[in-house]
């Protein structure tokens, strides 16, 4: 997801991202229980074919004839983790420029071409991948494929477009770097991943973006954009022969090349680190807690996913019940498992009243501990599984949703049968499975914690709840590239 901190203006590939609203400054919310999930309705994954072109491009065709539309999603196995040293944001800048002019079309001509057929063309980059997606009606399928091939294979990286995108990205980052939620997530990533590329915002930072040259962008594209490093999903109202014919026509003469990923360090072992970012104008505290977890391909992924959903997933999760319903400390609370190619993390988050900051972070850590120590009840697990299986049809309801699912599965080198058997595999997880993975991967004594808010109003609480060994950093002194996170 590709869960990384990214700009709102860049559409980022993600395996599953959650958006959590900010807490309201209020107290004594009424206790409430969310509605029960609806019974699972029958659903079957549409027929598909997976083929490989002679040049090495993997092509997945999913025949989905419920609407007269087609989605094409092309994924390149290179994202922000492959950014050149000191030039974070390269992959994101490359992605933002794909539809801003090619060797044959200007940015305006691309926009006019897609608008004239009522379609959509988007591109973005995450930690592990760069992707582009085109959505068109069935009668414009060939036009959409031509546009996708053009922006992927022949981006112009025009100097004026580079500067326009650079300026916009830096301006957006300036806004984000004043947002407590963005700051908290960015700092937590650094605590979890250290100096591994996963520890830095995919979008880069203002100083790294300023260093990126046109040659850097062209070299990133030349080095990693290759058919044998790409996955193409074509989903919608097409036949396998139509789709494969179009893929061969547009991408068949794209030359295979050797692709050498840069060497990446192993993520560090989890260690506890508590950081308070002082932002005196804050009216509440952004609280983030997390640790290193498992990669997407782990055989324990399904069980771990359910453990984290019980902790803080959709519906009546434990964090929501304790923090909001029982204690009235926050408006919302959640936890997410964020798996990537080389590693992953589990994080919990909430925004709470300043005077409740210490209590909130204590509760979150205690719930991580309870997950590891206590076997969950059958009814609690059944509720989480009912939500997962009941909402699964929404993830394969449209061509665009299916395209995201299938490229994810192929990218992580999983079987497409994972989508066919999702419900059976989800329901097969037992309370003992959840306890086993929680004990194997959850380490409450090594959780990292970040709080962003008016430190003068809550820092004295931390020692009283067992977290007195914290680092205090004024927001104006924050430097994500420094080992101690401080400007010098």
Task: Locate the predicted segments by residue.
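Sec/Tat signal peptide C-region and signal peptidase I cleavage site
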Residues: 19-23
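Positively charged n-region of N-terminal signal peptides that target proteins for export
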Residues: 1-4
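An aromatic/glycine/proline-enriched structural segment found at the starts
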Residues: 25-36, 194, 198, 202, ...
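Conserved, carboxylate-rich catalytic/transport cores that coordinate ions
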Residues: 221
């Amino acid at each position: 997801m590709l869960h990384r901190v990214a700009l709102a203006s860049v559409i980022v590939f993600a395996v599953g991202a959650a958006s959590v609203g900010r807490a309201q400054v209020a107290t004594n919310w009424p206790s409430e229980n969310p509605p029960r999930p609806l019974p699972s309705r029958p659903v079957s994954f549409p027929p598909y074919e997976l083929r490989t072109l002679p040049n090495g491009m993997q092509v997945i065709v999913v025949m989905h004839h419920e609407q007269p539309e087609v989605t094409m999603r092309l994924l390149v196995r290179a994202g922000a983790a492959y950014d050149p040293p000191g030039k974070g944001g390269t992959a994101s800048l490359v992605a933002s420029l794909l539809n801003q002019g090619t060797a044959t079309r200007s940015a305006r001509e691309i926009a006019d071409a897609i608008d004239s057929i009522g379609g959509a063309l988007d591109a973005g980059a995450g930690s592990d991948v760069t992707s582009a997606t085109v959505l068109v009606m069935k009668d414009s399928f060939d036009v959409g494929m031509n546009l996708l091939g053009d922006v992927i294979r022949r981006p112009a990286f025009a100097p004026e477009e580079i500067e326009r995108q650079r300026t916009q990205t830096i301006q957006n980052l300036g806004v984000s770097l004043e947002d407590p939620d963005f700051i908290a997530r960015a700092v937590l990533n650094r605590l979890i991943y250290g100096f591994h590329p996963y520890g830095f915002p995919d979008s880069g930072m203002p100083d790294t973006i300023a260093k990126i040259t046109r040659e850097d962008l062209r070299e990133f594209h030349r080095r990693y954009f290759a058919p044998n490093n790409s996955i193409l999903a074509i989903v919608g109202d097409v036949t396998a022969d139509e789709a494969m014919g179009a893929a061969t026509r547009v991408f068949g003469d794209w030359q295979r090349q050797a692709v050498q990923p840069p060497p990446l360090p192993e993520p560090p072992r989890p260690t506890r680190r508590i950081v308070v970012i002082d932002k005196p104008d804050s009216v509440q505290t952004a609280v983030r807690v997390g640790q290193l977890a498992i990669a997407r391909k782990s055989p324990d992924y399904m069980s771990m996913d359910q453990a984290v959903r019980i902790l803080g997933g959709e519906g009546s999760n434990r964090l929501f019940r304790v923090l909001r319903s029982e204690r009235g400390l926050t408006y919302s609370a959640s936890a997410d498992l964020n798996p990537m190619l080389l590693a992953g993390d589990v994080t919990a988050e909430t925004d709470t009243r300043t005077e409740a900051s210490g209590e909130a972070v204590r509760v979150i850590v205690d719930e991580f501990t309870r997950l590891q120590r206590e076997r969950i009840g059958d009814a609690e697990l059944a509720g989480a599984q009912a939500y997962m299986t009941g909402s699964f049809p929404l993830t394969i309801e449209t061509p665009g949703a299916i395209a995201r699912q299938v490229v994810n599965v192929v990218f992580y080198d999983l079987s497409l049968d994972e989508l066919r058997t999702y419900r059976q595999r989800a329901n097969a997880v037992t309370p003992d499975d959840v306890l086993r993975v929680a004990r194997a991967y959850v380490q409450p004594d090594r959780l990292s914690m970040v709080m962003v808010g008016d430190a003068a109003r809550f820092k004295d609480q931390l020692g009283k709840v067992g977290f007195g060994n914290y680092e205090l950093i004024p927001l104006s002194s924050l430097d994500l590239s420094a080992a101690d996170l401080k400007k010098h």
